[in-house]
Amino acid sequence: MKFSRLLLTSLFAWFSPVFSQPLCAQSDEGKLRILVFGAHPDDAQYKGGGVAAKWAKLGHHVKLVSVTNGDIGHWQSAGGPLAQRRLAEVKKADAIVGAETQVLDIHDGELMPSLENRLKIIRVIREWKADIVIAHRPWDYHPDHRYVGVLMQDAAFMVTVPFICSDIPPLKKNPLFLYSSDGFQKPYPFQADIAVSIDDVFEQKLTAIHEMPSQHYEGGASGSEEYVAKVPPASDEAGRKEWLRNLWVRRQTHEANKFRSVLNKWYGPEKGAAVKYAEAFEICEYGRQPKQEEIKVLFPFFP
């Protein structure tokens, strides 16, 4: 199965000039341009906030995009007021990360992989002139997550085709499309190709997530009075931050331990073994298939 996948990918890359061009930044200034898609106004920050901060620190251009407006993502409120609240939250969070913010005006829970939405995603990718695009896999517990993955797949390659969305110039090079990590097993589990240490930006990521209280401290759509009662109150900011830190230490430590062999591949056994917190990504078959030296250009954090 794995051999067949690699064979098909190799053949595709061999025959398609879009997939086999030398890799460099789309923009003339030489800085990378990265898009991280999430289904809701918090997903991109959770899944790629660490690596986004690392790129931003090096002067690269990062945008975190929510494909829906999050207007049903709370157990006590909904509609326009919630959408506006969540937009304000992610703007604060993204400013801390060093990224730009975009939230598409699609209702939470109603995202479909339609032609209309495919064209929206193509436009977002082209307008940003993206070198790297990250999104959910199309196998996830939430339909909005799944369809973000499908829409990314459907936009891959099409972003280079001149006569679709012809009012926006096509990209000269197909971006590297990546899936963010998850724990789902069917039809096949997440397979990490790249794992990045976020030890140096972990506190920065936590500070950003702290600015989205509707989702963590209040529980989002899955919250309740019982949930909120277990979280330190807003008056105890230090207690809240400690509660949040303990939660994310567990999550990002699990990610690092789960993908330790991939960290060792990119950092070497000694440095890889020392990584505490990580974010991992899988290369989508429908976009660029970079060689190892190309990945090091796109992820300029590896030794």
Predicted ranges, named:
Residues 1-5:
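Positively charged n-region of N-terminal signal peptides that target proteins for export
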Residues 7-18:
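Bacterial N-terminal signal peptides
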Residues 21-128, 134, 150, 158:
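Active-site rim/loop-helix segments in enzyme catalytic domains that contact anionic ligands
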Residues 131, 175:
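Conserved acidic residues
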Residues 138-140:
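Short glycine-rich anion-binding loops that position phosphate/pyrophosphate groups of nucleotides
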Residues 145, 150, 154, 177-179, ...:
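Functional cores that coordinate and move charged inorganic groups
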Residues 152-166:
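Cysteine protease catalytic core and zymogen-processing segment of caspase-like enzymes
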